[in-house]
Each structure stands twice: as C-alpha cells, then as structure tokens.
UniProtKB/Swiss-Prot annotation:
Gene3D superfamilies: 1.10.8.60, ClpX chaperone, C4-type zinc finger domain, P-loop containing nucleotide triphosphate hydrolases. NCBIfam families: clpX, PRK05342.1. Component of the ClpX-ClpP complex. Forms a hexameric ring that, in the presence of ATP, binds to fourteen ClpP subunits assembled into a disk-like structure with a central cavity, resembling the structure of eukaryotic proteasomes. This is ATP-dependent Clp protease ATP-binding subunit ClpX. Residues 1-54 form the ClpX-type ZB domain. Pfam families: AAA_2, ClpB_D2-small, zf-C4_ClpX. The gene is clpX. ATP-dependent specificity component of the Clp protease. It directs the protease to specific substrates. Can perform chaperone functions in the absence of ClpP. ATP binds at P118, S119, G120, S121, G122, K123, T124, L125. Belongs to the ClpX chaperone family. It comes from the Bacteria. GO terms for molecular function: ATP binding; ATP hydrolysis activity; ATP-dependent protein folding chaperone; protein dimerization activity; unfolded protein binding; zinc ion binding. It comes from Lawsonia intracellularis (strain PHE/MN1-00). Zn(2+) binds at C13, C16, C35, C38. One of its GO terms (biological process) is proteolysis involved in protein catabolic process.
Length: 417
C-alpha cells in the first residue's frame, strides 16, 4: 500500500465489503457506507415482502362475495361478476411492478364495470359496500349534473376532487379508490349519428369521461372547480382508480329483444309467439352494441369491459332486506328503541306489508326507509313520553290501516290509546 493510500484509505461498503472503486456509487451515512448494488438488493427484498403482505391482504373473489352477502340481498350473478372484476383490478394494481418486470410484453387492462338495472335494486349499495370491504376511498357522482368544461354544471374532474377529499387528501390512497357514477344512461346521446350541435350534458360528457375512466394524468383543483380559479392544480393518475357506472337504462330491454328476434329470420328459423320475456332475462343478454344503439358512444362502451345486470327485487327479497343485512332497517330501529329500554318487534305479516308498499311505490329497496319512516313517526313521537313500556310489537294492522302497535308494559299488556 502506498503512503498516499495510507493517508486516504479506500472507503468500503459496510454490507458487501466492496471498495469504492469496485462499485458505481457509494453512499455515506453516519459511520457506515452502502453501495448501489446493495441498495438494489435491499429494494428487491422490500418489494418482495410488500408483495407477500399484499397477497395476504388481497381478498379472493369468494371472500369478496361472502362479504357482499352480509350487506346486499339477492343479485347473486352481479355480486359474483363484481367480485372477480374487483379482485383482478386490485391484483393488477398491487402487482404492477412484478408484472412489468416478469411479463413486460403483457399489459393488463382495467376492469371497469357497468351495472344495468332498475332504480332501488342495489347498484349504489353494491359499489359502496365494495369500497367498505376493500377499505379504499369511495366517491359517488350523478352523471346528470356533469357537463363539459366551460358550461354551467360540474366538470368531470370534480369527481376526482371528491375522491381526493374522501381520502383526506392522500393522493396515493385516492389513486387506488373506487368511483361510482350513477344515472349514466341519462347522458346517452340524443341521436344515433354523431352530434352536429353541442350536446354538453350527453355525448359531450361521455367524451370528457373517456380519458379519466381509461387512465390519465388529470389536473384537478383541490378546492373544487370554478369558485377558486387561482388555486394550484394537483396531478392525479387515474390508471388505478376502478370506475363502476350504473343506470336503469329504461328501454334497453326492447333493443335487446329486437336484436334477439331479428336473429330468428329466414327458412328453418324457429317462429316464436309474441310473449314478452322477463326483464331480467333480457338484460342478461345485453351486448356492447345494444348500449351503443341506446346512445352510449362506442369509445365509452369500450372503456367498460365488464357488463352485468341487477334484477328488480321481489317482495320476498325486500323482506330479507329488512331483516338480514348487518345494517338492516329493522335492526337500526330496534337499536334506537333499545336506547329507551324498549324491545321493538315486527311480525312476519308486518314485514310483508312493508315490502308490499315499497313494491307498490315502485321504488325498490330505496323505498323501504320511506315506508318505515312514515310508519314509525307517530310511534317514536309518543314512546319517549310513555312510562313502563318494555316492548312494542308492530303487526300488519299498523302498516295497512295506521293502527296502533301493541305496547307491552312491565305489569300488564294493553293497547295504547
């Protein structure tokens, strides 16, 4: 060793022992050094451990559906399709680095979902419950309020603002969230051909939504759109945001039926009667072209590869909605009554009567709360002032004729006057 080397000894990596001249870069710390090769090795270990953690946390499609079953009644096929789509989406998100390094030629596309079905059948609840199960931020938007930039209404970027706010302004967390856009059928274009005049709340909105649904670097105003023009914009990557869009699509069943019947033509074709098929049976057979004919532009339909439908809920389904989910309406009211030390009980006939009223109003599961509120109002008004009541029984007479419930007291049973 030369005298000069003794004065300036070569620095060594504290991990692998290589000298500073044997490596590309040596980073100094407090009394230690680490080379670029060891940094790369440490990074690989961290990524591998993170993937193992993610693999443990990532729910299987079966587990996702089981969790959905706790909150959503019926819609078995829709829950199964959503579970697979969501599982694949987050597998794509969490394993992005592994996929790009091991399968560089394979690019996994987003599994955005379209839910078709009548109002009150559980579309919004499905999307909201998925976000709750996966513990990711969630935002709901109403497509009818959206317009192209520069027109009166909400810009499509405002949807991303809401997601960011719901993620407590954590950009990384927000960029892995779920956005549900309701009433998507209401922004269908008004004619089959391309729009000549400006359609700012129809085809124009579809065009504006295309990029953020597909995945883009969007500039979003953190305080919302036009009221704060001087604010700095935040760049959000939407590539890993799952978009679920839903709508009633009234009249889509006719388009599907026309296509199916149109296929049975010519010699040897089976001639069937004009018996109408059930709505659910028709919506099971929706093709992308049917949606285009309805008024969604082909590019928009192409960005949403997963199509599924939800059925109208039967009276039996609505009775189950009232009692089975973790946050069932009857359980909520029972909890309220418990706070007054009163047990609330609904007879099976009462539950059927409530479900029947919701069906009559054609509001589906959404109408159950309205029916319950109107029934329970007077009871909840009087009960806190009543002394000695330990149980309140609601039967079908209360539902159908606005009769009084049966109040059971500590010492005797009587009907409240």
């Amino acid at each position: 060793m030369s005298r000069n080397d003794e004065k300036n000894p070569q620095l060594l990596c504290s991990f692998c022992g290589k000298g500073e001249y044997e490596v590309k870069q040596l980073i100094a710390g407090d009394g230690v050094h680490i080379c670029d090769a060891c940094i790369a090795s440490c990074n690989e270990i961290l990524v591998r451990q993170e993937l193992e953690t993610v693999e443990e946390q990532l729910l299987t499609p079966q587990e996702i559906k089981e969790r959905l079953d706790e909150y959503v009644i019926g819609q078995e096929e829709a829950k199964k399709i959503l579970a697979v789509a969501v599982h694949n989406h987050y597998k794509r998100v969490f394993y992005a680095e592994k996929i790009s390094s091991e399968h560089g030629d394979v690019e996994l596309e987003k599994s955005n979902v379209l839910l078709v079905g009548p109002s009150g059948s559980g579309k919004t609840l499905l999307a909201k419950t998925l976000a709750k199960i996966l513990r990711v931020p969630f935002a709901i938007a109403d497509a009818t309020t959206l317009t192209e930039a520069g027109y009166v209404g909400e810009d499509v970027e405002n949807i991303l603002v809401q997601l960011l706010q719901n993620a407590d302004y954590d950009l990384d967390t927000a960029s892995k969230g779920i956005i549900y856009i309701d009433e998507i059928d209401k922004i269908s274009r008004r004619s089959d051909g391309p729009s000549i005049t400006r359609d700012v709340s129809g085809e124009g909105v579809q065009q504006a939504l295309l990029k953020i649904i597909e995945g883009t670097e969007a500039n979003i105003p953190p305080k919302g759109g036009r009221k704060h023009p001087q604010q700095e914009f935040i760049r959000m990557n939407t590539s890993n945001i799952l978009f679920i869009v839903g709508g009633a699509f009234i009249g889509l069943d006719k388009i599907v039926e026309q296509r199916i019947r149109g296929g049975s033509m010519g010699f040897g074709a089976k001639v069937s009667g004009k018996k109408e098929r059930p709505l659910g049976q028709l919506l099971e057979q929706v093709h992308p072209n049917d949606l285009v004919q309805f008024g969604l532009i082909p590019e928009f339909v192409g960005r949403i590869p997963v199509l599924t439908h939800v059925d109208d809920l039967s009276e039996e389904d609505l009775v189950r909605v009232l009692v089975e989910p973790k946050n069932a309406l009857t359980r909520q009211y029972q909890k309220l009554f418990e706070l007054d030390n009163v047990t609330l009980r609904f007879t099976s006939d009462a539950l059927k009567a409530i479900a029947h009223k919701a069906i009559e109003r054609k509001t589906g599961a959404r109408g159950l709360r309205n029916v319950m509120e109107s029934i329970m109002l007077d009871i909840m008004y009087k009960l806190p002032s009543m002394v000695g009541v330990k149980e309140c029984v609601i039967n079908d007479v209360v539902i159908n004729t606005n009769g009084e419930p049966l109040y059971i007291y500590d010492s005797e049973v009587q009907v409240a006057l």
